[in-house]
Amino acid sequence: MVTGELKSKIDNLWELFWTGGLTNPLDVIEQMTYLMFIRDLDDADNVRAKEAAMLGLPHKSIFAGEIQIGDRKIDGSQLKWSTFHDFPAAKMYSTMQEWVFPFIKNLHGDKESAYSKYMGDAIFKVPTPLMLDKIVTTMDAIYEQMEQIKSADTRGDVYEYLLSKLATAGVNG
């Protein structure tokens, strides 16, 4: 169930995109989806690490060691939402644009997979560092609110609400 408070935070996030110049509702939902995926990758990796530690099993993080993007390398931990969300706006933006987004586009490495075909055309469209900083902060607040609700279907409800905004945006121009 999407509460009034959660709807308000989602509306604020939507407004950040619109006032920042990203006015196509499909682009807004697409960018939100990419950013949610990036955050979820970090969260899922952290859960797997904790579970492995509890069971005394090894865990190889997808963010472990150096990650190569093109002909450059970066410490994989820099690509984690939980790391870069604390960066100053300019550094967060360059990290997202130059490292995180290319990383998720090539996550599976198999150029023929359905994932690679879908992500092959993905473009990071957030236009400014300050806008990204505000979006990341707002998304952190949304995730915090979603954790408090503790419903198994909250994510689906949030996405349904986003899609309803898409329908409304189409009607309102």
Language-model segments: what does each one mean?
Residues 1-173:
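Non-catalytic, mostly N-terminal accessory regions of nucleic-acid modification and defense proteins
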